[in-house]
């Protein structure tokens, strides 16, 4: 015969787990009134449900970024779910914040970026014994949708970091920059640069950052195109260099037309500011952009 449980305990268990009242009552009865044991029972049942949901497609979600107060370290993630409703849910945001904070505080993630699956087995920095994967599965059980950590990025710098999030978490930018000092003018400039990255999708900071094989492939394609168009051999190289300039303006941040003043390139705006700001690297995530 199952023991009677108090409604007070049922409510307490519900607050702790987010599970339904009836499920909490049954778990407490099964656990003989022991709240911790009941939590485990719900967790096991919840995680079993989470496993079933893991096959569903995750298209919505959130790009979440945290930069430390001293601007020396920062982390950004793409966390996906199935619906926009859940993406705007407070529980989902808390999960995104906790995972991002974990990446920021766990030393083994220093200056690393990659697929979310790479960090699932890590024990949480603030709760040893529990992994990132378990945290996500518990959230799946509570929220009722599949959730996936798609990718992450962690920057550590001797200089400064700046972050920018656009569209309520649809695009995020983490920017590493050098400046003699931090002041309002510098912060306005790097905010403009971060917005540029969000809007214009550059892949490299400067031309020298483009891998040689990428440049060679582009040159080869442009050369073939020019020859197929019947351009004379002696002017093909000139045509290729002209078209490469367009390629740079599309892919290279410093070569791009500045979104606030398109007659100028980003490098001109930075130089003319006289602030001695140098853009070192950036990471840009867009929801579903894998």
From Swiss-Prot:
One of its GO terms (biological process) is translational elongation. SUPFAM superfamilies: Elongation factor Ts (EF-Ts), dimerisation domain (SSF54713), UBA-like (SSF46934). GO terms for cellular component: cytoplasm. GO terms for molecular function: translation elongation factor activity. It is found in: Cytoplasm. InterPro entries: EF-Ts_dimer_sf, Transl_elong_EFTs/EF1B, Transl_elong_EFTs/EF1B_dimer, Transl_elong_Ts_CS, UBA-like_sf. Residues 83-86 are annotated as: Involved in Mg(2+) ion dislocation from EF-Tu. Keywords: Cytoplasm, Elongation factor, Protein biosynthesis. Pfam families: EF_TS. Associates with the EF-Tu.GDP complex and induces the exchange of GDP to GTP. It remains bound to the aminoacyl-tRNA.EF-Tu.GTP complex up to the GTP hydrolysis stage on the ribosome. Belongs to the EF-Ts family. HAMAP family: EF_Ts (MF_00050). This is Elongation factor Ts. It comes from Aquifex aeolicus (strain VF5). The gene is tsf.
């Amino acid at each position: 015969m199952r023991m009677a449980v108090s409604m007070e305990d049922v409510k307490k268990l519900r607050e702790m787990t987010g599970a339904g009242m009836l499920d909490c009552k049954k778990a407490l009865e099964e656990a003989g009134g022991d709240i911790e044991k009941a939590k485990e029972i719900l967790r096991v049942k919840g995680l079993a449900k989470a496993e079933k949901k893991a096959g569903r497609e995750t298209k919505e979600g959130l790009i979440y970024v945290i930069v430390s107060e001293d601007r020396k370290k920062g982390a950004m993630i793409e966390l996906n779910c199935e619906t926009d409703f859940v993406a705007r849910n407070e529980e989902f945001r808390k999960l995104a914040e906790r995972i991002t904070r974990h990446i920021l505080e766990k030393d083994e993630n220093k200056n690393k970026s990659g697929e979310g699956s790479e960090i699932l087995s890590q024990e949480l920095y603030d709760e040893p014994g529990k992994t990132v994967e378990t945290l996500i599965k518990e959230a799946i059980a509570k929220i009722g949708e599949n959730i996936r950590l798609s990718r992450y990025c962690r920057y550590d710098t001797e200089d400064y970091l700046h972050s920018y999030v656009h569209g309520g978490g649809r695009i995020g930018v983490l920017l590493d920059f050098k400046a003699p000092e931090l002041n309002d003018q510098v912060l306005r400039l790097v905010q403009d640069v971060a917005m540029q990255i969000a809007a214009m999708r550059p892949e490299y900071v400067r031309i020298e950052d483009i891998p040689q094989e990428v440049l060679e492939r582009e040159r080869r394609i442009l050369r073939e195109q020019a020859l197929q168009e019947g351009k004379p051999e002696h002017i093909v190289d000139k045509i290729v260099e002209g078209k490469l300039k367009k390629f740079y303006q599309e892919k290279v941040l410093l070569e791009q037309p500045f979104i606030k003043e398109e007659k100028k390139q980003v490098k001109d705006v930075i130089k003319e500011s006289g602030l001695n700001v140098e853009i070192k690297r950036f990471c840009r995530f867009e929801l579903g952009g894998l």
